[in-house]
Amino acid sequence: MEVKIFAFLQIAVLIAFSLHLASAGSKELSGPESSENSIEAAFCDTNCTEGTDGVWSGCSAGCFCVHVGNSTVGRCMTFNGVD
């Protein structure tokens, strides 16, 4: 019984150590994680509303409307850094 518990603990420590090594890699920014490739989401200065015809309006150029669930009021957002 004690041998099984000891073996289980050894395996658990080995797995935890392996996961740590995998996640503790280089912190240098590269590839898709690079800030050169990142985009930024920001709120615009306006809100938006859904009309009775189901069309959303109120966002200025370059912004789009986001809302939660079945709400008829939302906030306008934009993405910066998108080609």
From Swiss-Prot:
Q: Which UniProt keywords apply?
A: Disulfide bond, Glycoprotein, Secreted, Signal
Positions bearing carbohydrate: N47, N70
Q: List the disulfide bonds.
A: C44-C63, C48-C65, C59-C76
Q: Which interval of the chain is the signal sequence?
A: 1-24
Q: Which residues cross the membrane?
A: none
- Compartment(s) where it occurs, according to its Swiss-Prot or TrEMBL record: Secreted
Protein function: Salivary chemokine-binding protein which binds to host chemokines CXCL1, CXCL2, CXCL3, CXCL5, CXCL6, CXCL10, CXCL11 and CXCL13.
Q: What is this protein called?
A: Evasin P1090
Supply the source organism for this entry.
Answer: Ixodes ricinus
- Organism phylogeny: Eukaryota, Metazoa, Ecdysozoa, Arthropoda, Chelicerata
